[in-house]
Swiss-Prot record:
ATP binds at G37, R38, N39, G40, A41, G42, K43, T44. One of its GO terms (molecular function) is ATP hydrolysis activity. The keyword Nucleotide-binding applies. Residues 5-233 form the ABC transporter domain. Keywords: Antibiotic resistance, ATP-binding, Nucleotide-binding, Transport. One of its GO terms (biological process) is response to antibiotic. It comes from Bacillus licheniformis. Pfam families: ABC_tran (PF00005). Signal peptide: none annotated. This is Bacitracin transport ATP-binding protein BcrA. InterPro entries: AAA+_ATPase, ABC_transporter-like_ATP-bd, ABC_transporter-like_CS, P-loop_NTPase. SMART domains: AAA. Part of the binding-protein-dependent transport system for bacitracin that confer resistance to this antibiotic. Probably responsible for energy coupling to the transport system.
Length: 306
């Protein structure tokens, strides 16, 4: 499987501030690559460099196996993209907007606009003014515009940002269809980890401009650990009892009386009995598994995600 995007020590500085710091990413052909990070982690800056919108301070970019800086014009003809919120003429229809874009980029195929509108599910909205579109419809129209020239690579910057649950589900279905049915390689940035979790083949996690990890998602799922979660009236007492009676040391203490126990998974009944007999109220017991979001928070050292 060939490599579609490869960066080597890609760095972008603004004054003394490193927005992207020696970034090395590898995106394989046909994959959906999830580029994950908190807001301000360097995701959009990276995408702008990949699209030639800003120049890196140092480092190399190869796309389709070619040096991006030496073959920028030819490479960009093979890429579709959405960076941040796509802009359109609000007083024109979807078809009229796409017609303008088609003329600008030299697309003359007669049915190109009809085809991309059907791909994104807007074929029945051709007469409605874009100003009356929902945010989800505008995002899909943005993808339609990005598909006009039949790209091999699609780069999407936070395409689910601001969408309601239905819009997110529709966007996820569309992205999956483009990758798996039309063999388009997709590079998608996001901080909405639960959406990426259901979509991607590979994950790259960026924090403060640095790539912390790049891993196939299947491997990441195997790494995520199961645990017993207790919600208790007295965490401190419960921890002492677990250590003394069961020699349990692989656990985490969370807010709201939550303790996650990563060992002794088959002994929840005995643990429950231990707590109750020692005057601890057991409010909840569940068997759960770390999500990608849990792993992400641990990897970046805690804190909020957004």
């Amino acid at each position: 499987m060939s490599t579609i995007i490869k960066t080597t020590d890609l760095t972008k500085m603004y004054g003394s501030q490193k927005s992207v710091d020696h970034l090395n990413i590898n995106v394989k052909q046909g994959d959906i690559y999830g580029f994950l990070g908190r807001n301000g982690a360097g995701k959009t800056t990276t995408i702008r460099m990949l699209l030639g919108l800003i120049k890196p301070t140092s480092g190399q970019i190869e796309i389709f196996g070619e040096n991006f800086f030496k073959n920028k014009k030819e490479i960009l003809r093979r890429i579709g993209s959405i960076v941040e919120v796509p802009g359109f003429y609000a007083n024109l229809t979807a078809r009229e907007n796409l017609l303008i874009n088609a003329k600008i980029i030299g697309i003359h195929k007669k049915n190109a606009i009809d085809e991309v509108l059907e791909i994104v599910g807007l074929q029945h909205e051709t007469k409605k003014l874009v100003g009356k579109f929902s945010l989800g419809m505008k995002q899909r129209l943005g993808i339609a515009r990005a598909l006009l020239h039949y790209p091999e690579l699609l780069i999407l910057d936070e395409p689910t940002n601001g969408l309601d649950p239905i819009g997110i589900k529709e966007m996820r279905r569309l992205i999956h269809s483009l990758a798996k049915e039309r063999n388009i390689t997709i590079f998608i940035s996001s901080h909405i980890l639960s959406e990426i979790e259901q979509l991607v083949d590979h994950v790259g996690i960026i924090h403060e401009g640095k790539l912390l990890e790049e891993i196939p998602f299947d491997h990441l799922k195997k790494r995520n650990r199961k645990y017993l979660e207790f919600q208790l009236s007295d965490q401190n007492k419960a921890v002492v009892l677990m250590e003394q009676h069961f020699d349990i040391h692989d656990y985490e203490v969370h807010q709201d009386g939550i303790i996650r126990v990563y060992s002794h998974l088959g002994q929840q009944g005995k643990l429950n009995k231990l707590f109750v007999e020692n005057g601890i109220d057991v409010l909840k017991i569940t068997m759960s598994e770390d999500s990608l979001e849990d792993y992400f928070v641990k990897l970046i050292g805690g804190g909020t995600i957004g």
